């Protein structure tokens, strides 16, 4: 949101280039992991063979509006909590509640029986290499590497074209996020993967709540974090990648705020401000598809 506003209001592409660098590094890294057989992206939670087009459209619109009203997305909320923002603490709990309702509660039933019934069935998983592999004679692994290098390289090129962008903070911000995403894919899809669970004799991904391969996500893990805290005495509730990432973001943001002396308490400025943040928190996970 901040990157888009910088471009539209000030014609400043610095943060947009940071995002572009992060996206490019992540795409290239994941493509290399997949092409070398370390992970299988077709087994991730994001690549089913059903394209839920209406859920995706409505969810994206809700998320966009919610992000503006709540002063940021799920990850930004965690950063603001670490910096002393009490408004974001409220957003965290409301968003966690609504996300749980959307995953397993009232909104889940509504979602599954309405807009999730509208989808496009695909003959393969919905990642681009799998789709193109069925249309060409090129092996999927080769397509993963080629497309990853081309698309990811284009994002990296856009970021680095501006010489003024070549500063340590910009490169660390973009490159660091991209490398973190690659690391999470590796942990989720390779390190935490068992080809045959002794109990079920089926393959399993150990470190995620969904039981499938995931990358960094900061909305559904809100619900999982609250669930873990509320049912802490239940030994079946274990720390997962998403829950640890939520805690790590808050702790990291807090330490950064202390070291840079930017930590300060902040709260709502009035009824309108409170209402906007509450509505924004609800919209952030009134996205029908539980894939975030």
Language-model features and meaning:
Residues 1-10, 264:
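Membrane-interface helix-loop junction between the first two transmembrane segments
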Residues 3, 38-49, 109-120, 127-135, ...:
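Membrane-interface helix termini and inter-helical loops of multi-pass transporters
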Residues 18-26, 30, 55-62, 66, ...:
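Alpha-helical transmembrane segments in multi-pass membrane proteins
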Residues 40-54, 255-280:
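Membrane-embedded helical hairpins/re-entrant loop segments and their flanking transmembrane helices
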Residues 66, 70-120:
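Membrane-interface helix-loop-helix junctions at boundaries between adjacent transmembrane segments
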Residues 104-158:
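Long hydrophobic alpha-helical segments that form multi-pass transmembrane helix bundles
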Residues 168-266:
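Transmembrane helical segments that form the transport core of multi-pass membrane transport proteins
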Residues 285-290:
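Conserved small/polar residues in nucleotide/adenosyl-binding loops
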